[in-house]
Amino acid sequence: MVQQGFTAALSVYKFIDSVDKNMGDVLVTGGTGGVAVIATKILIKLGYSVVVSTGKLEEQKEVLLNLGVKDVIHRSEVDDNSGRPLLRPRWAGVIDTVGGNTLATAIKTTNYCGAVTTCGNAGGVDFTSSVYPFILKELLYMV
């Protein structure tokens, strides 16, 4: 649990320098994992509006809502396979604990001047993206 707490705290620490709590919703991926739950709790305590994605929507939605999250979405909503370099902006920022295509989709859907931190690879160590989100949205990406 110590490693999960440290990883979550480090991701949030880097994140809050770039994303103000009034900028909009923050997505936390892998919502029922240890790092994601701790990051979610920290963000909520700091006053951020948090949306969590999970593959365990039916089993864990109430638990996550009881933590104080704004919404819980299915992980398929952050798993785009369209090949488009940019998608409709949804998030002020993202704390990604999954990696893979979830990370690529999170980058595509982050708002202008948003930030994405990543600290996990349960969804895979490789991801495909383009430079467009970084150039056109002035996106900040942190590992």
Residue ranges and their predicted role:
Residues 2-76:
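Mid-domain Rossmann-like dinucleotide-binding core that forms the NAD(H)/NADP(H) cofactor-binding site
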Residues 69, 90-92, 134:
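Local beta-strand N-terminus motif with an aromatic residue
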Residues 78-90:
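Short amphipathic alpha-helix with an adjacent loop that forms part of the alpha/beta core around
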Residues 92-95, 117:
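N-terminal Rossmann-like NAD(P) cofactor-binding module of classical short-chain dehydrogenase/reductase
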Residues 55-57, 76-81, 120-124:
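Short, acidic/turn-prone active-site loops that include or flank metal/cofactor-
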Residues 75, 96-97:
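Short, well-ordered coil/turn residues at beta-beta hairpins
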Residues 59-60, 81-83, 101-105:
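Short acidic active-site motifs
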